[in-house]
């Protein structure tokens, strides 16, 4: 089966949806929308639709474009996924697709502990029980929203109150149903091929001719056709589901189709929000399907891994990533997982590294980076999209450089008591730049990192052998807050007051402390020299605040 890109946009795309969409019956779209239209009409006009009006609505819904039907079905599947407990979502996919023997699939209960109700994206005050929705979607049985008492659970079901496994749900048939099934006269009974035409004995006797009035607008042939037809039938070849790399649960699905999902489609900036009555009354207690409108969560990781808790800095590596962006332009708008061998020498990040949503913007520096980069290769991993801060690599000598801060941030810097990176890598990182080869006599400031004290700088580093007392480094922090996606990393001014007293009691008499706000963007260091306490600044660094490292109160700022 193929799917239109209108149906499965980047917001609607999900392996959970792609696996289940071929099993949704075509009657589901027409049936749910028809019932919602009838309900809205009754609320507005305080009377029921006439047969002609209802038939016109039915014909309109049946003739709707397949792409529209699939888009609706994909959004409804996404909503159902939220209502299924996380640990049962995989079993649900495998059992519906026929790859596993049916087992119980429990849903998240409502506030009273009962099965939840949803409005099936029609924004009408008509809600459906989840088990009813499952039967209509995957079995094509035209049940009413009030037919919940007609449903019975299989004897093998261990939790009948919350189970939404379609194979465990049956429809009870009473005597009246059997009687009507035998005697009801269809409008097309006179046409060849109809049940009544083929078997005259099924025609009701004279005393029953006026006993039955057909209130629906579907005939038998229509119901059978739409209940047996998948909702994906009749669409063009534009969107794949056949290949889901590294997804062992779907590797044999549609094995005859060899397709590859395009990664070059532009990410949507905003997902249309669905306002539903049941969401207003009872929001789902679980996470969202698209982890947010622009969720860092959806696209490149497997559907069951996105539900894992990512609060720990140590993340579990999947068996194989679904895909990796081949270029900065092809990067997915969601988080991509890279194997560990892509970044050797970074023990602080166990098993995986998260790439950010978009490649970093070009540097606004008016001079080329080669002017301040050393020709020798650095020890950290170089990637056009991912930047690894040098503090993640204890062997990287660039950790000795002092990063700068973002002057546009209004927050006050606070010390980091642990002296280590906190949690995840939240945004883009630019490597700390080494001193220019033209200033070979300049030496970087040495940082002493401890677990109990703020990061301190020893004054002995300024008077080391071979280093002039006047040689200093300056940290560049751009005025433009969008420079390299600046995060909340800041460096406070020196922890001395004007009387020369240390602000932190833990600081010794020969140390000067700096503090961190939070991990974020790393700024560059440019060597400069001080003559008679006057900094000799580079000529090509306008629009940057210069914080001199080495003397407490000697600061300079270049003018525009």
Curated annotation (Swiss-Prot):
Residues 257-369, 384-445 are annotated as: Disordered. Residues 324-339 have a biased composition (Polar residues). The gene is NFIB. GO terms for biological process: anterior commissure morphogenesis; chondrocyte differentiation; club cell differentiation; commissural neuron axon guidance; DNA replication; glial cell differentiation; lung ciliated cell differentiation; negative regulation of epithelial cell proliferation involved in lung morphogenesis. The keyword Amino-acid biosynthesis does not apply. Recognizes and binds the palindromic sequence 5'-TTGGCNNNNNGCCAA-3' present in viral and cellular promoters and in the origin of replication of adenovirus type 2. These proteins are individually capable of activating transcription and replication. Binds DNA as a homodimer. Keywords: Activator, DNA replication, DNA-binding, Nucleus, Transcription, Transcription regulation. It comes from Gallus gallus (Chicken). Residues 1-195 bind DNA. It comes from the Eukaryota. This is Nuclear factor 1 B-type. PROSITE patterns: CTF_NFI_1, CTF_NFI_2. Pfam families: CTF_NFI (PF00859), MH1 (PF03165), NfI_DNAbd_pre-N (PF10524). A motif (9aaTAD) lies at residues 396-404. Belongs to the CTF/NF-I family. GO terms for cellular component: cerebellar mossy fiber; nucleus. GO terms for molecular function: DNA binding; DNA-binding transcription factor activity, RNA polymerase II-specific; RNA polymerase II cis-regulatory region sequence-specific DNA binding.
